[in-house]
Structures are given as C-alpha cells and as structure tokens.
Amino acid sequence: QRTRLVELDGEPVRLIQSWEGSDTVLIIDAVRSLHPPGTIHHFRADGISGAAADGIALGGGHLLGLGEAIDLARALCLLPRDLDVVGIEGADFELGQGLSAPVASACDLATAQLVDQLEQLLLSLVSRSGAAARPAARR
C-alpha cells in the first residue's frame, strides 16, 4: 500500500493515469455554482455524471475536467473503487487571480478534512489487515 500526493491541471487523461491502479482516491478541486465562494462540497464518484454533481459544475475553470475524467474512467472500467471529491466553491476563475479570503480559508479547512479522512482510511486498512499497532518494547 502506498500513498501519493499529486498536483494536476485537471486534464481528464492525466487524471485517469494518476489514479490508475489505486483503490481509493481523494481529490480537491474548484467548483462553480450559485453557492457563496468558499463553500465546501463533498461528492462520491457514483454521484457524479458529466461535468456536474448535484447541479454543481466540477472543475471550476477547466473546459474539460474532473467530471469528464470520471465518466471516461467509468466507461473504460478504470474508476477506482472509492473516489471522493472535495469541491471548493471558487470566487473568480479568470487567469492570474489569486484566492479570495473565503476560498483560501476553505482550502485550509478542506485540507484538514482530507487529512482526517486519510487517517481514518489508514486506521481502517490496519484493522482490516489484522495488524495492531504495538508500542516498541523497551530494553
């Protein structure tokens, strides 16, 4: 088992290649809807169709992006067993714009949520493997 952190541009083929062979994938991406900037949304791949999930446009500033990658991976039987998306509502998708204060704050919160999710995933893997964490013996 290994864990990788990957930063990508949202291009569908690169996304699919990045999660190839993975059982569990956690993604943070920008989204666009009528919600206020900085709103955090949670989706599972089975709730995503096309470029949208629950009426929220995935991949905020990408022409083609995460939603299309998930659809393509599903069609090619390359979708990981578990794929979760944390979508952060963007404020401005123009080139060269930095993050607004609400979006930057949401990024910090979403990162903390992903770390918690990773910790839970690792604990679940350890318990499923039957390996218990034991303190090192002292001499």
Predicted feature locations:
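Short, internal active-site loops enriched in acidic
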Residues: 90-92
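N-terminal catalytic or cofactor-binding beta/alpha core of small enzyme domains
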Residues: 1-88, 97-109, 113-139
